Regions:
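Acidic low-complexity segments
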Residues: 85-142, 153, 209
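Histidine-anchored nucleotide/phosphate-binding helix
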Residues: 178-194
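N-terminal, Lys/Arg-enriched amphipathic/low-complexity engagement segments
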Residues: 1-46
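Hydrophobic alpha-helical positions that pack around
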Residues: 164, 198-310, 316-321, 331
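Gly-rich Lys/Arg/Thr-decorated short loops/hinges at beta-loop-alpha junctions or inter-strand turns
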Residues: 105-106, 136, 159-173, 295
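Ferredoxin-type iron-sulfur electron-transfer modules in oxidoreductases and energy-metabolism complexes
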Residues: 349-365, 375, 379-445
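Short, well-structured beta-strand-loop connectors
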Residues: 48-61, 80
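Conserved hydrophobic positions within beta-strands
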Residues: 76-78
Length: 445
């Protein structure tokens, strides 16, 4: 069975909510929309205090080509434009809306009828995706229309759909495949048409046999779409690892990107969002969020409007357990601990993980023993012990030369470290510093 060739680990899966059908969460009383929910330029608000909005009203315009518009997920009145600390831990400008009713924009098709036919050109499909504010739903939140617009000299050969969901605990993509397989496949066809390719792949790890079976059955009418079962190994959902596993091609080091080996990679949730944007005129304003944890009373998958506070999802899943040690935005490998559970759900909010005291406890960090376990598991072939040490000492020139910008921040190194070193924290610090140095250097050219 296929998998990527370098490194990888096998953390406990803990898919506690995989058997729980998607539930629609109640509307929030107030909704908060950070103006930066994607990779790229922040958006610019186009509403002001006192303005009345509906569900699907554009409230912030894209700030450039690599950016994505933001739409209201609620109807009501704009209370203020202020700032909020989001799940990343940074304070960002945001639009605050007081919710009144649930009135939708009339242009949105709210029917459940499956719409397969699309007579739009590739350029028109890409424009609709852009105008709907669709971004990568796997967490990176890269604007989807940008991936469908290859740089000069590059040509796409295939679309690869990431349905791996290798992050422990999270089950949103799994449930989406079980409940919306036909819509996903139409979305894949739309992405293929927009990318001007004739071959599509959907990579699914073999710990989801029900999803593999159902998607294979539904895809039988699309001979140009292949369902690819994959061996379970983390971080198979990484873009470069998925390309390696599915089509046996390796993406070179940055600044090379997947299109340089002919691949356009999109998350399975993105394929569904594309279907809704193109076929239903529905902008991206809601997503599926997993709320889970070993002590959580009712691990669940919620269809959640953007801007909803995470505390509302936690309450819907039974509330914070008494033995809560940490709340993570995302999963245990790549997610970040939250200091405040009132942070809003954004486009990249895939899950809320509540760890108990025992899980949350970190072992005492000790000196590196040079065991090289982190080197053996790194899926990018890096030396994480060295990157972490040099970052801790501020040796930015050294870490840049050691290819720190190739790190995908999967956390495999920290997971396997017997000395409990906070390697991912140091490497993220180093990447931030080196990224700033590179941008400043390029600005002078």
């Amino acid at each position: 069975m296929k998998t990527f060739r370098i490194g990888g680990v096998h953390p406990a899966e803990n898919k506690l909510s995989s058997g729980k059908a998607i539930e629609t969460l109640e509307l929030p009383k107030k909704a908060v929309f950070p103006l930066s929910q994607h990779i790229g330029a922040p958006t610019t608000p186009i509403v002001k205090r006192g303005d009345v909005v509906k569900v699907g009203t554009k409230i912030a315009e894209a700030g450039g080509f690599v950016s994505a518009a933001i739409f209201s997920s609620v109807s009501g009145k704009v209370n203020k434009i202020d700032s909020v600390i989001d799940a990343s831990g940074y304070r960002k400008p945001a639009i605050f809306i007081d919710v009144e009713g649930d009135e939708w924009e009339e242009s949105i098709d709210r029917s459940t009828e499956l719409v397969k036919e699309c007579n739009l050109t590739p350029e028109e499909i890409t424009a609709k995706i852009k105008n709907a504010g669709v971004v990568g739903m796997g967490g990176a939140c890269f604007p989807t229309h940008v991936k469908l617009t290859p740089p000069p000299g590059c040509k796409a050969e295939c679309v690869i759909i990431n349905a791996v969901e290798c992050e422990p605990y999270l089950t949103a993509d799994h449930r989406l495949m079980l409940e919306k397989p036909e819509q996903i496949l139409v979305g894949v066809k739309l992405l293929m048409k927009a990318a001007k390719v004739t071959k599509g792949y959907i990579g699914i790890e073999n710990n989801k046999p029900d999803a593999i079976k159902l998607m294979t059955e539904k895809a039988s009418i699309y001979p140009d779409i292949e369902i690819v079962p994959l061996k379970v190994k983390y971080p198979q959902g990484g873009e470069k690892q998925l390309i390696d596993a599915v089509i046996n091609r390796q993406v070179p080091a940055p600044p090379a990107i997947p299109i340089h080996v002919g691949a356009v990679v999109q998350n399975v949730g993105t394929a569904y969002a594309v279907y809704e944007a193109v076929q239903k005129n529905k902008p991206l304003f809601e997503r599926i969020v997993t709320v889970t944890g070993k002590s959580v009373k009712n691990p669940s998958n919620f269809l959640t409007r953007m801007g909803t506070p995470m505390s509302q999802l936690i309450e819907a899943a039974g509330g914070l357990p008494e033995d809560t040690g940490k709340v993570i935005g995302g999963g245990p490998m790549m997610g970040k601990a939250l200091s405040n559970i009132e942070v809003p759900i954004c486009k990249g909010s895939s899950g809320v993980l509540i760890m108990n005291d025992k899980e949350a406890a970190r072992g005492e960090a000790k000196p590196c023993i040079r065991c090289a376990k982190c080197v053996s598991v790194c899926p990018m072939g890096l030396e994480p012990y060295l990157l972490a040490t040099c970052s801790a000492h501020g040796d930015w020139e050294r870490v840049e030369n050691e290819m720190i910008m190739s790190c995908i921040e999967c956390g495999s190194c920290q997971f396997t470290c017997p000395s409990h070193r906070p390697m991912l924290d140091y490497i993220r610090l180093g990447k931030g510093k080196v990224g700033g140095i590179i941008r400043a250097r390029n600005a002078k050219k």
